[in-house]
Amino acid sequence: MRIEEDIKLGFKDVLIRPKRSILKSRSQVDLTRLFIFKHAQNKWSGIPLIAANMDTVGTFKMAIALSSFGILTAIHKYYSYLDWKKFIHTIPGTVVKHIMVSTGMLDEDFVKLKQILSLSSKLKYICIDVANGYSEKFVTFLKKVRECYCDKIICAGNVVTGEMVEELILSGADIVKVGIGPGSVCTTRAKTAIGYPQLSAVIECSDAAHGLGGQIISDGGCVVSGDIAKAFGGGADFVMLGGMLAGHKECEGLIFKENKKRYMIFYGMSSKFAMDRHIGGVARYKTPEGKTVKVLFRGAVSETINNILGGLRSTCTYVGAFTLKELTKRTTFIKVSEQENIIFNNQEVSN
């Protein structure tokens, strides 16, 4: 047993200090990024946000909506091959290039992955997604996928420490997904005591990844657009969103009415609800590590995205960053004991 004495930080523990700026308008800020990936050597340009590969968020409809903004969607792994075939043959290539194909690490997952990727050469992203990216089995599977697809951009995770980020990049990952337990419907930290405050994880993991020419995704923990700005300020190359995109018409959660209001079911992918739906229940040796909640139905996702992008542009303006890439260099975090004045938070007038 050992104890690390330094305090690790989450998004709620900091604010970004404003700095002098010569920007005259938020409209001058460019949020697009251009990446050339370490192993695949492919280029990608767009706004580096990603809809999470949760079955209510990472949907085909979400991919179509977000592609118009130049934003990625990690399509969840529960669509069938026939679902994929129908989808790929009915959408333009501009949508396909903003899609990640998600997979687990079972043998049948690999077979299905190969079938899906055979549908279009424009499918460039693979997202190998497991809850615990620290297992040797996961690293072995990553190497197997890289050997088979030398030209694909591979994202792998989840981990939260620099040494494992390095291991995954050296084993074939172009991008490493960072985050254990920060998600809005994740209970891993409560159930297992395992985790790492997200901002510190991003800062440490981005340092490790960038030293090897890789990138990271900050996955989880964002509640407002300011949290996304903090993730980018801390060194994240991409930010993945689940709860912030839940409840929209492009999602596939169950919709119901309660007290004359419309709600949508949203749940973690390790929740009992998800396991009952996809694998026939919770195995006797497991415990659910996610919760099921109701969120207000919010209509089209486009308005939410515009609000997020507006917040990011404003952050950049406050610190004098003309581009999103500059934000990390312009960021100085200050540790705080408060974030905002919440006195009227429950008394807002609906538009």
UniProtKB/Swiss-Prot annotation:
The UniProt function text for this chain reads: Catalyzes the irreversible NADPH-dependent deamination of GMP to IMP. It functions in the conversion of nucleobase, nucleoside and nucleotide derivatives of G to A nucleotides, and in maintaining the intracellular balance of A and G nucleotides.
Biological process (GO) annotations? purine nucleotide metabolic process
User: What GO MF annotations does this protein's record show?
Assistant: GMP reductase activity; metal ion binding
**Gene that this polypeptide is encoded by:** guaC
- What positions does the entry give for NADP(+) binding? 108-131, 216-239
Assembly and partners are described as: Homotetramer.
CDD domains annotated for this entry? IMPDH (cd00381)
The UniProt keywords, alphabetically, are: Metal-binding, NADP, Oxidoreductase, Potassium
Q: Where does K(+) bind?
A: G181, G183
The record's active-site residues are C186
> Could you state one GO cellular component term attached to this entry?
GMP reductase complex
Q: What class of enzyme is it?
A: oxidoreductase
User: InterPro entries, alphabetically?
Assistant: Aldolase_TIM, GMP_reductase, GMPR, IMP_DH/GMP_Rdtase_CS, IMP_DH_GMPRt
The reaction(s) this protein catalyses: IMP + NH4(+) + NADP(+) = GMP + NADPH + 2 H(+)
What Gene3D superfamilies does this protein map onto? Aldolase class I (3.20.20.70)
UniProt superkingdom: Bacteria
Q: What is this protein called?
A: GMP reductase
What family does the Swiss-Prot or TrEMBL record give for this protein? Answer: Belongs to the IMPDH/GMPR family. GuaC type 1 subfamily.
Q: What is its EC number?
A: 1.7.1.7
